[in-house]
Amino acid sequence: MLELAKETDFEAVNRLARQVTAHHAQWTPELEVVEHPYPMDFFLACIKPDSIRENAIYVMRQEGRVVGYMRIYLWNTNSTVSAKRTILSIDDIGVDEALRNQGIGTQMMAQLTALAKEEWGCSSICLYVDAPNESARAYYEKCGFRVRNIGMTLRL
């Protein structure tokens, strides 16, 4: 079940975040794999009941064990040319590399979609994915995501 992380999930979430960071470092070499990608003070801020507006960490459990996580937040459009709406942004998502391709990510995404729609009143979910990460892009498309924007980076 997908739920807001607890303080006792600190090490498990950081272990998964290290896996994700190591994977992404192949496309973003300046990423540094550190012991705690989410330091304790940041982690604690992300697990407060009202943290969804800033940064919230949700975990997926199987038999009591953390097998996946997401760092997410809500934001509202603030435009004079479009309708006001609430959007859920996924900043990080990871499933234990030993358990990938077993449907855990699909379950996480389905449960997150239900929360976004029913609990938080979101009109959409957005995320960014590294362009060379073809397996992630295919997974997100399978979940119903469509390319909307193309981000670009100029390395200095």
What is each of the regions a protein language model found here?
Residues M1-L16, H24-Q26:
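A short beta-loop-alpha structural element at the N-terminal edge
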Residues Q111-L112, C122-A136, T153-L156:
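Conserved beta-strand-loop-alpha-helix junction that forms the acyl-donor binding cleft
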Residues V59, R65-L74, S89, G94:
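Conserved beta-strand in the GNAT
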Residues F42-V59:
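A short helix-loop-beta-strand connector motif used in the catalytic cores of GNAT acetyltransferases and
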